[in-house]
Swiss-Prot record:
Belongs to the ETS family. One of its GO terms (cellular component) is nucleus. This is Transcription factor Spi-C. The gene is Spic. The keyword Membrane does not apply. It comes from Mus musculus (Mouse). Keywords: DNA-binding, Nucleus, Transcription, Transcription regulation.
Amino acid sequence: MTCCIDQDSLGQTFQDAIDILIQQSAGESQYSSENRNYMAIINPYPHVRGNANYYGMSPTENPLYDWRGVTNGSADLYLEGGFHQSVQNIAESQLVQPPFFQQKGGRGRRKLRLFEYLFESLCNSEMVSCIQWVDKARGIFQFISKNKETLAELWGQRKGNRKPMTYQKMARALRNYARTGEIIKIRRKLTYQFSEAVLQRLAPANYLGKDLFYPQYGQPDQGYLSLNHWNANHYAHGSYQS
């Protein structure tokens, strides 16, 4: 009887142990499942391992780069590109300079006046068949009779007129200059003279009897008088004497 009781007690003990093992096994299985789900959220690409040995380096080695290095490198590249762009803009702004006298006289700039155009033509060797100096030191010039209309047409184009300019209209403007004293009519056919004030402003060195270098006008369609920097500023800010 005692032997049977011991066997039953031993069997119950084994059964309890088996139940505990089964419960523990079930709990570990549940934990493993939850752990796998959690790891799946953290690392959605489980085939990419986070072990440093997988990348061929020891765990104590520093990474080849970090995000700060990448950010700083990008900033340096951006600043370098901006610097070159600024240099390029400065170079372009230096290459494209607005003319001192615009053809149609944009806002803030003067229109090219007739006596300025005549002086420019006198300084241009290509216009010698239309207009010539008679006495350069005194500012006396003369229109060439057979080509005076050509000169007038070119003046109209420089002004931007739609209708062709004629010498008759240009001569009318010259008579208006005679009233202000800027250009004086000489008692000689097609001959005029710049006033001293205008001549001083247009060519002060020439007026003083010194040799003045007149540059060749490579672009005749430019609507401005080619003077040196000092002459241009002096002329622009000076007042005319009547």
